[in-house]
Amino acid sequence: MLEISPWETLVKLLTDSLLNCTGTHEDVPHAKTFLRSLTTTYIASLAVATAVTVGTVCLAVLHLIYIHFYITHSSRRLHIVLLACTAPLVSLLALVAMYMPRVWFLSHLLSFLYFSFALWVIICLLLHIFDGHHALVTKMMQRLQYVEIATPPFCCLFPCLPKVRLEGKKIRWCELMVMQAPIVRLFATLVSLVIYFEYQDQGLVPLKVLDFITLPSLLAGIYGTHILVTTVSRMDELISYRYVVVFRLLDFFFMVFGLQQPVFDFLARYGAFGCGTVLPAIETSFYWKNFFTVIEAFCVTLISTVLLQPSKSSFFDKHPSCRSMSSARSTITDVDTDESTT
């Protein structure tokens, strides 16, 4: 048996596999063939994933009903609808990929594209809360002095990053960092689809190279989002909206989703899933990755249902509890004003 160097092992893990699966499932079956040859484990996992996705969609419909009836501003309503659709859309795409193994790549690309778009939406929602970029910068310069740049994803590598003096152009640069991420991701998605449909499995290396090239764009978008949210989170205006809760849910979901793909890919090439029984090794790993994505989407939807109830967030300004809180705050303000004048 020939021994290979650690470098050769790493190259094989990135571009090929350590398994010798000749004579087994080399081609990904069509959905009809796949569904006819399911084992008990696959049947049970598909049943669970379908039920969980139905639950996620039902909760999402409930969210959309509350958003429609209890949010006044149409543009704010649109932003929140787009964010509320993240988990159910990702769950549905993952479920479709479980039933149709050949579309796993398309499912992953579309989900990743939507996550990148959601980063920009969360910043647009922040700007809307403060009535635009100029109003946000004005309030920040009145109450804050520095911009927090020691934030993920670079704070772990550079924990001693200094605070930067707050300026309007720096906030604009952060916004542009976030905005470029979905644009670059859209271009990368289109190029990836061309490579995949043209070269199939032979396009693996170009796809990995493309992911590596576009990684700085994604990291810049995430970094810009974290800088803005971390800096603005110190302002009292955001507390009643629970905006930071919305951001943390999206951020954590995106992080887990993004890390799962390379982890499951590495495990499959290392041999953790064997040669596969119904599907090839790589597709078997992505099948289970999609299963976990469905579960994660449900957890995110359920947590958001509990933490972002209309009675707890000022986003739902037409909800009775929110109106009563607003009237109470205005009464306190009037009393303070009267006392100051006397």
UniProtKB/Swiss-Prot annotation:
Q: Does the keyword DNA-binding apply?
A: no
Q: GO CC terms for this protein?
A: membrane; plasma membrane
Q: Which UniProt keywords apply?
A: Cell membrane, Glycoprotein, Membrane, Transmembrane, Transmembrane helix, Transport
Q: Which GO terms describe its molecular function?
A: transmembrane transporter activity
Show the coiled coil region(s). none
Q: Where in the cell is it found?
A: Cell membrane
Please indicate the ranges of residues that lie on the Cytoplasmic side.
Answer: 72-79, 131-176, 230-243, 312-342
Question: Which residue spans traverse the membrane?
Answer: 51-71, 80-100, 110-130, 177-197, 209-229, 244-264, 291-311
The residue ranges for the Extracellular side of the membrane come to: 1-50, 101-109, 198-208, 265-290
Provide the primary localization: membrane
Q: Which residues are glycosylated?
A: 20
Q: Name the membrane topology term.
A: Multi-pass membrane protein
In the record, the note on similarity to other proteins reads: Belongs to the OST-alpha family.
Function, in words: Probable transporter.
PANTHER family for this protein = ORGANIC SOLUTE TRANSPORTER-RELATED
Its recorded name reads Organic solute transporter alpha-like protein 2
| Organism phylogeny | Eukaryota, Metazoa, Ecdysozoa, Nematoda, Chromadorea
